[in-house]
């Protein structure tokens, strides 16, 4: 398939630049992946769509204030976006500047918040392809503390506005726990504490994986044929406890419901890894990077239902949804969502999808 097969027209006014004040009040498009049937709901209706004994898989990564502004020692302005924390003082980052800093170059970060000549000193240690390895000069302060002081929330480029104080809470799931993401697992933004308590009271089970979402999630696909695309790598943790819960859920005849594409990629990576090591009917713990790319023709080994936001045209995420619900069903649902003026992308509305069991498998 071609990347252009996943294009659709989206009016600019349908891009959500601010979230709903009430997380559960967003709209929910329910898509039956088996027959393409569509229902228009409110997100709080997921309480009626999820049954006792079903298992919800959440991604508990926490977004770090990963964007910093500063300058090089030579005076040139820079914008630094942390991609991955390596340890308490070193990180990999994207750096925007008129001229890329050279190895050994001194950087002064956070002067927009700390004042001129008061920036936090760092050094560009090495370059790794498009990423720069940066080390804080002062070892008495941890990177996370530095980011909390001078960092900005890394809102996606399509939101097209500076971050605001409210984004520190709004661009974070209520169950986020493990710092490391530079983008939110946005399907989870629609859950509030009250809805989670109601789901628990109904007998719905919860488990948490960790996938630290990287900035690569916003990168366009730059090839014509989707099979030629190489995914960026992101770090994943799927514990033995999660694996046990998934196996028990399947044995009980209940459903595994992934909250977000990052949860899908996490548990499907763990299942694929188990299959590659000779255990095709199992899922095993997974603590490693994943670059899994799921597109039409790829099979799902674990996930039965998916809760997800509306994604960018020609993105790997709409390709994943198309693999799950069927290409025609997905593109028709997106067409209806535009017609019905759903809100799109990170701060937008959501979908609840059950898997199309008849999608073609190429593997």
UniProtKB/Swiss-Prot annotation:
The source's domain of life comes to Bacteria
Q: Which UniProt keywords apply?
A: Cytoplasm, Queuosine biosynthesis, S-adenosyl-L-methionine, Transferase
Molecular function GO terms recorded: S-adenosylmethionine:tRNA ribosyltransferase-isomerase activity
Named in its record, the pathway it takes part in is: tRNA modification; tRNA-queuosine biosynthesis
* SUPFAM superfamilies attached to this UniProt entry: QueA-like
The enzyme's E.C. designation? 2.4.99.17
The alphabetized list of GO BP terms reads: queuosine biosynthetic process; tRNA wobble guanine modification
Where in the cell is the protein located?
A: Cytoplasm
Q: Write out the catalysed reaction.
A: 7-aminomethyl-7-carbaguanosine(34) in tRNA + S-adenosyl-L-methionine = epoxyqueuosine(34) in tRNA + adenine + L-methionine + 2 H(+)
Q: Which family does it belong to?
A: Belongs to the QueA family.
* Function recorded in the entry: Transfers and isomerizes the ribose moiety from AdoMet to the 7-aminomethyl group of 7-deazaguanine (preQ1-tRNA) to give epoxyqueuosine (oQ-tRNA).
Name the UniProt record assigns to this protein: S-adenosylmethionine:tRNA ribosyltransferase-isomerase
Which organism is the protein's source?
Haemophilus influenzae (strain PittEE)
Gene name tied to this protein: queA
């Amino acid at each position: 398939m071609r990347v252009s097969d996943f294009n659709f027209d989206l009016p600019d006014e349908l891009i959500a630049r601010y979230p709903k004040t009430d997380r559960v009040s967003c709209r929910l498009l329910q898509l039956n992946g088996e027959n393409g049937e569509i229902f228009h709901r409110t997100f709080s209706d997921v309480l009626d769509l999820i049954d006792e004994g079903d298992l919800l898989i959440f991604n508990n990564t926490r977004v770090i204030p990963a964007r910093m502004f500063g300058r090089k020692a030579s005076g040139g302005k820079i914008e630094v976006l942390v991609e991955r924390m390596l340890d308490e003082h070193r990180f990999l980052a994207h750096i925007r500047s008129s001229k890329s800093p050279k190895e050994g170059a001194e950087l002064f970060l956070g002067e927009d918040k700390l004042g001129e000549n008061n920036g936090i000193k760092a050094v560009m240690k090495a370059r790794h392809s498009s990423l720069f390895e940066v080390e804080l000069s002062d070892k008495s302060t941890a990177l996370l503390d530095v980011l909390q002081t001078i960092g900005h929330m890394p809102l996606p480029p399509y939101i097209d506005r500076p971050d605001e104080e409210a984004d520190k809470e709004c661009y974070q799931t209520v169950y986020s726990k493990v710092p490391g993401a530079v983008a939110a697992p946005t399907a989870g933004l629609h859950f509030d504490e009250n809805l989670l308590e109601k789901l628990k009271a109904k007998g719905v089970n919860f488990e948490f994986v960790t996938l630290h979402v990287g900035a690569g999630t916003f990168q366009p696909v730059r090839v014509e044929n989707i099979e030629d695309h190489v995914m960026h790598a992101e770090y994943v943790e799927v514990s033995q406890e999660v694996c046990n819960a998934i196996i028990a859920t399947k044995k009980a005849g209940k459903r595994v419901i992934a909250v977000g594409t990052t949860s899908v990629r996490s548990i499907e990576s763990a299942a694929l890894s188990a299959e590659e090591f000779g255990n095709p009917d199992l899922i095993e713990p997974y603590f490693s990077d994943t670059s899994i790319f799921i597109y039409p023709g790829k099979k799902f080994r674990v996930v039965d239902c998916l809760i997800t936001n509306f994604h960018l045209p020609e993105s790997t995420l709409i390709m994943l949804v198309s693999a799950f619900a069927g290409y025609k069903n997905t593109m028709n649902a997106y067409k209806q969502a535009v017609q019905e003026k759903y809100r799109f992308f990170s701060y937008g509305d959501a979908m609840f999808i059950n898997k199309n069991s008849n999608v073609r498998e190429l593997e």
